[in-house]
Amino acid sequence: MDFIIDIIKKIVGLFTGK
């Protein structure tokens, strides 16, 4: 389930990048 972690990191990056 590494792809799930990658997707979560992308979503988190959007929030942290805001």
Swiss-Prot record:
Keywords: Cytolysis, Formylation, Hemolysis, Secreted, Toxin, Virulence. It is found in: Secreted. It comes from the Bacteria. GO terms for cellular component: extracellular region. The modification N-formylmethionine is found at M1. One of its GO terms (biological process) is killing of cells of another organism. GO terms for molecular function: toxin activity. Its main location: secreted. Virulence factor. Causes hemolysis of erythrocytes from sheep (HD(50)=4.79 mM), rabbit (HD(50)=8.76 mM), guinea pig (HD(50)=2.00 mM), dog (HD(50)=5.35 mM) and human (HD(50)=6.34 mM). Acts synergistically with beta-hemolysins from S.aureus ATCC 25923. Cytotoxic towards human dermal fibroblasts. This is Hemolysin H2C. It comes from Staphylococcus cohnii subsp. cohnii.
